[in-house]
Amino acid sequence: GGLLGLEAARAMRRFNTDITLVEHSDRLMSRQLDITAAALLHEQVRALGLKVIVDDGALALHGRHAVQSVALRSGRSLPADTVIIATGIVPNTALALASGLPIGRGIKVDDQLRTGDPDIFAIGECAEHDGVVYGLVAPCLEQGAVAASVIAGTPARYRGSVDGTRLKVMKTTVFAAGAHPDRSATGAFGSLIFKDPANGHYRRLLHARGR
């Protein structure tokens, strides 16, 4: 139910195949969208003829010589002859954990990309900065530039990246950038919301410190 999964499902649907999209979280594109936006996307996906199951996940694949069914965590079994796995980015923190470095969703780093050990740096998809793990190329390159400068003795700070994503396969354009909208519930951000249900429009702008 993330970007890759939705794009793959839409591509397969063009061949008139029966598609079931299984998402482990409680909504589609949970890393980018709030509940309201995800519900609108859910409707668009179903209108394309795709079945959607949320808050569940694959437990096992069954079949002889080829897959015949998928067993889900909920106990359901889905008949299948093709399975596409689009799990996205999951940082491997095993080495950092064994080394005693602080970890969260990824290896925690400060503004200089240093880990809990100041002589060890982490960048890219394994690093967690200010609670965020970036799964895109551009933030990884920005982190690399900062880490290289610090290692070379040049003062530099990483202040986070604008993590923008756009879904291009649905009739309704979906775009998200910046902080996750759920963070407004913590009080760190305020939000301005525009809704036009008749036309399927929903916009949410997060703001902090008056901007």
Language-model region placement:
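Cofactor-binding loop segments of dinucleotide-utilizing enzymes, especially the Rossmann-like FAD-
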Residues: 1, 24, 125
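Catalytic nucleophile loop
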Residues: 2-5, 148
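Flexible, glycine-rich phosphate/dinucleotide-binding loops
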Residues: 5, 28, 61, 93, ...
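Hydrophobic alpha-helical segments, especially N-terminal targeting/anchoring helices
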Residues: 22, 71, 109, 206-209
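FAD-site-proximal beta/loop scaffold in flavoenzymes
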Residues: 63-71, 76-149
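Mid-to-C-terminal Rossmann-like scaffold of FAD/NAD(P)H-dependent oxidoreductases
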Residues: 126-211
